[in-house]
Amino acid sequence: MQTLLKFSQRIDDITEYFGKASAFCVLLTIAIGFYNVIARYLGRFLGIKFTSNMLIELQWYLFSLTFLLGLAYILKHGENVRVDFLYTNWSPKTKAWVDLIGHSLFLITFCVIGLYVTTHPVLQSWGRLPDGTFGTWELSPDPDGLPRAPIKSMILVGYGMLLMQTFSEIIKNIKVIQEN
C-alpha cells in the first residue's frame, strides 16, 4: 500500500502544478480580455484597429485551458459537484465507499470514453490523414488566427490528468476504508 500511496502523492503533486497553471490562465485570460475590450473601443474612437483575431482566439484558448487543466485539481480538493446535503453527514468510511464506487464506475468510464472519442479528432487536427501519414495541421478559419491542434491536444491532457487523479483518489479512498 505504501508504494501506491507514494504513486498517489506524485499524481497529487502533478495535479497541484496543473491547478496553479489553471489559476495563472485565469489571470492571463482576464488581462487579454481587458486589453481586447479597451483596444476595441479605443480603436473605434481613433479609427485604428488595435485588436487581432490572434488575441481574441488566445483569450478563448486560455479560457479553455483554465477548465482543462483545473479538472483534476477540482477533484483532488473535493470541489466537484456532489449531493452535499447527504454526503456531509456520512462517516469518513461511508464517504470513501461512495467515492470509491462512483469514481470506479462512472469517472473512469467518463475519462476513458472522453479519451477515446477525442483522440481521432486531435490527430486529424495535427494533420493526420486517413492513410496514416501527416499533412498540414488545422488552422483557424479567421485571418491571423491560431492553429487548432495545440488547444485540441489539451483536451487529451485534461482527460488524462482527470483519469490519473481519479486513480489517486481511489488509492486514498481504499486507505481510508482500510483504516476505519
Predicted regions, residues:
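Alpha-helical transmembrane segments and membrane-interface helix-loop junctions
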Residues: 1-180
